[in-house]
Amino acid sequence: MAGTSHADAYIGLGMTDDGSGTAGLAGLNALLAPPTRPGCASPVNTGQAHYVLDTAEFALHRWATTGIRPARAPRLQVDTSGSAPVFVLDAHGNVEGGVRTPAVDAPVATLSGLGQSGASFCFLFGTTTPFTAERLAALYPDHATFVTKWTASTARGVASGFLRPADAAELVKAARQSGVGG
């Protein structure tokens, strides 16, 4: 999954997810102002892995009970031309390829599963580097532009089999309620 880490901010946000849809907006806001963890040097990853993992669990159950295979994703892009392999990054610093979510296709931050330092388990949390207000304004001159790009990415996720429709609705609602753009 592009832009995710082994553990992320949803570990804390998920405790407040009561199914009402407010967790989507909390997750989007966390992209803009990522939380930290005690002992970790940088704000933790706020990628949207939990939505894709929810879909994967559904797809696994469906495969086991009906034989319908889950969706297959392209691999994360890796450059092996140097002395050590490195991820291929887009203009925003997010990895290319893999399962895509709105957080990497309509980005408001650079998301990585790498680069976290600090105490004990910090390396599992990856990092989030929010874009500056100037960069956000250049990417999304108005709120409608952001919502359109976020919604299109969400629709691609559903069509590709990597987002569930209910999660997609929560993501789109969060984009509409956000203050991103303009």
Give a label for each model feature.
Residues M1-G182:
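C-terminal His-loop and adjacent cap/lid subdomain of alpha/beta-hydrolase
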